[in-house]
Design a protein with these regions (language model features):
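Macromolecular interaction modules
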Residues: 1-198
Length: 198
């Protein structure tokens, strides 16, 4: 499916809310997001290397889906469970609407590496290095203009979300490949927790 939009999220979770956070994410948050027209897939990852604890991204038809009436209605009317999680569980939130370009169009893997940057693309991300690392799939993400509005959910978190300018996603079959790639390009390695698709 040729989806052109990404909602990319990196975050930590307060340890005392971890169990509640996981139940909420799996039984309410992912299904609710995937109910919005234009959302096709949500994937959750857990950190293998230092950095944020969690990484989640959603594939959408195009970035405009993330300013649609249906999506904004959800953001502005959080459920009681969402209010609690946003206010007390989430921290160090980095949330960005992106356009995406698929560089290597292979199957999704069970492990991944992300690297975000501002300005020029890091030299280490040259085609030769990427090929040497052997990813199954590679995508580049670029922030769009759909990142300016402060939603009710963001207000609950009590601090403005961080934003990326650009990021790369490399997907691998095995953990050792992801760890090697993260060490080589200075990124963070992840293992897949869950996928929900339409």
């Amino acid at each position: 499916m040729n989806t052109r939009g990404i909602l990319a999220v990196w975050n930590d979770c307060a340890i005392e809310y971890m169990a509640e956070y996981e139940v909420w994410y799996q039984t309410e948050h992912l299904p609710q997001r995937l109910s919005v027209p234009g959302f096709y897939c949500g994937r959750r990852f857990e950190a293998l290397t230092p950095g944020p604890q969690f990484f989640t991204y959603y594939e959408v038809k195009d970035p405009a889906v993330l300013t649609s009436q249906e999506y904004l209605e959800i953001l502005e009317n959080p459920t009681p469970a969402t209010r609690k999680i946003m206010e007390y569980a989430f921290s160090n939130m980095n949330r960005t609407v992106c356009s995406r370009e698929v560089v290597i169009d292979g199957a999704s893997g069970g492990c991944a590496v992300t690297l975000a940057w501002h300005g020029e693309t890091p030299e280490v991300l040259n085609p030769k290095t990427l090929a040497m690392l052997g990813p199954e799939r590679v995508e580049t993400w670029t922030a769009t203009s759909q990142n300016n509005e402060l939603s009710a959910e963001e207000k609950l978190r009590g601090i403005d979300d961080q934003k990326i300018s650009n990021a790369i996603l490399l997907e691998f079959l095995r953990e050792e490949q992801a760890l090697n790639a993260a060490a080589n390009i200075g990124g963070q390695a992840w293992r897949l927790l869950a996928t929900l698709t339409n």
